[in-house]
Regions:
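Short, charged, low-hydrophobicity "junction" segments
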Residues: 10-11, 251
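C-terminal catalytic domain of Rieske-type non-heme iron oxygenases
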Residues: 3-5, 71, 148-357
Length: 357
């Protein structure tokens, strides 16, 4: 598969959950992300060879750094000595030296050296959280576990990110909205007939519909029962170690050969008020059709796709933070209710485990 990355605004490490779980109440987990699964972190090209990148993810501070050979590491952005930010320090190739006192932490979260006191008992101890990482589809993915589940959950990547007959473009953006609202928006196909009615790909079809939930081995479909292949008519929520959605929307003839385009979507919590969204826009095309699709996307279609995303961003960012506390839902919202209950149940279970563990 070929993937290009657009933005708007390696080596596997040993896991280490050194974060302080005392703040992980059910409400906190619901707002900043459940644990014990993988999340997309950022586009791979955000961290070039020899580079560092400071990030907030799931309400916590992290540091990515890449070695000259391309291998990638992620550390909690906290020096084990006095708690200073490692992201203020110096990249030493295979480790980070804290700016405050020079303490060196390698990619596994282990203290490699204490220059001010050689032989110090901190040396050789793994004291900094260092999540497992992989890179796929032009993005970095990380596993966020808790003390009871430090080893990464089994991960099955979306087939659209690994299939050689799929050509995709990664679109990345950061939105000032809670991550759950971004996920719920994807589980709400009917908004396409209204919010996106004037877009290049969602102007056709009925503005009335009935929906159903259809279970799958990896999640569930939420789909219209009276229309298919006309508009944003279905979405599948997939839980394969990482949560993602798949959907397809018909292209007009002006989009060239290759049939409908699909979207693999993910939302990663930054904190309770912000999220990072990842949308791989893909098409199953080969040979000259692949070349045509990629040319048309870059020259014509990309801006139109960003226009649709901008409509979503505006709508979601204008939602009140407590919008879900005063709703009057109806049949079209079955997908929203399903995913909301799913995450609430998992947040409560993980909070109980943190308390009893």
């Amino acid at each position: 598969m070929t993937t290009d990355t657009a933005t708007h605004t390696g080596e596997t490490t040993r896991p280490s959950e050194v974060a302080r779980p005392g703040n992980r109440t059910a409400d906190r987990l619901f707002d900043t992300g459940i644990r014990n699964q993988w999340y997309a972190v950022c586009p791979s090209d955000f961290v070039p060879a020899g580079g560092m990148k400071r990030l907030t993810l799931l309400g916590e501070e992290w540091l990515l750094f890449r070695r000259a050979d391309g291998s990638l590491h992620m550390l909690e952005d906290r020096c084990p000595h006095r708690g200073a930010r490692l992201s203020l320090g110096k990249h030493l190739g295979d480790r980070i030296a804290c700016w405050y006192h020079g303490v060196q932490v390698d990619g596994t979260g282990t203290v490699a050296a204490v220059p001010g006191l050689p032989g110090c008992n901190l040396e050789g101890k793994q004291l900094v959280a260092a999540p497992h990482l992989i890179e796929a589809g032009g993005a970095i993915l990380a596993y966020f576990g808790d003390n009871e589940h430090p080893e990464p959950a089994p991960l099955v990547l979306p087939e659209q990110l690994t299939d050689p007959d799929v050509s995709a473009f990664l679109c990345y953006a950061e939105w000032n909205v809670n991550w759950r609202y971004a996920v719920e928006n994807l589980l709400d196909p009917m908004h396409g007939s209204f919010l996106h009615r004037d877009s290049h790909s969602m102007s056709e079809g009925q503005t009335t519909a009935r929906f159903r939930i259809r279970e799958t081995e990896r999640g569930f479909f939420f789909e219209k029962t009276d229309q298919s292949g006309v508009n944003f008519d279905w979405v599948e929520l997939c839980r394969t170690g990482i949560d993602w959605v798949d959907l397809t929307i018909p292209y007009p003839p002006t989009a060239g050969p290759g049939g409908p385009f699909g979207i693999v979507g993910m939302a990663t919590p930054i904190d309770e008020d912000r999220c990072a969204v990842f949308f791989w826009r893909y098409r199953r095309v080969t040979d000259w059709q692949r070349d045509t699709w990629r040319f048309l996307y870059r020259t014509v279609l990309e801006d139109r796709h960003w226009d649709v995303l901008e409509q979503d961003r505006i709508m979601l960012e204008e939602l009140r933070s407590d919008a879900d506390q005063a709703e009057n839902l109806y049949q079209h919202d079955l997908g929203v209710v399903r995913v909301r209950r799913m995450y609430r149940t998992e947040a409560e279970a993980q909070a109980r485990a943190n308390t009893t563990g």
